[in-house]
Amino acid sequence: MTHDNKLQVEAIKRGTVIDHIPAQIGFKLLTLFKLTETDQRITIGLNLPSGEMGRKDLIKIENTFLTDEQVNQLSLYAPDATVNRIDDYEVVGKSRPNLPERIDTVLVCPNSNCISHAEPVSSSFAVKKREKDIALKCKYCEKEFSHYVVLAN
């Protein structure tokens, strides 16, 4: 193997690889999706060189597979991500996130008066695609926000 072809992040035998995450978003995904709440090994590549993106992040989670719902929820943060299923060091499935109709438990409502902050309820947002933006409407306070506002929260 030449120096140019060397893997920058170690291969995994079985699990999930989330590739083409925009740079600086990898840690946010780990936190929001609670991906670190596992005993499985997680490998993270940050600011890796990418021909398409310039720089990208990468997450590899051994012996763990994301559900379709989890893959689709990635679309707000990493709409061009590729989620690869790995078995015996081979890619056995590839998927890309699609914008879901609803996102539950992952995001926090930016409305400080929203009941979701004081009550033991999981957040829930309806997702609406706009011309140049994505709107998220909180199930509890019914306020609508640009996804940029919710993501920055």
Swiss-Prot record:
Binds 1 zinc ion per subunit. It comes from the Bacteria. GO terms for biological process: 'de novo' pyrimidine nucleobase biosynthetic process; pyrimidine nucleotide biosynthetic process. One of its GO terms (cellular component) is aspartate carbamoyltransferase complex. One of its GO terms (molecular function) is metal ion binding. Keywords: Metal-binding, Pyrimidine biosynthesis, Zinc. The keyword Repeat does not apply. Coiled coil: none annotated. Pfam families: PyrI, PyrI_C. Contains catalytic and regulatory chains. NCBIfam families: ATCase_reg (TIGR00240). Belongs to the PyrI family. This is Aspartate carbamoyltransferase regulatory chain. It comes from Enterobacter sp. (strain 638).
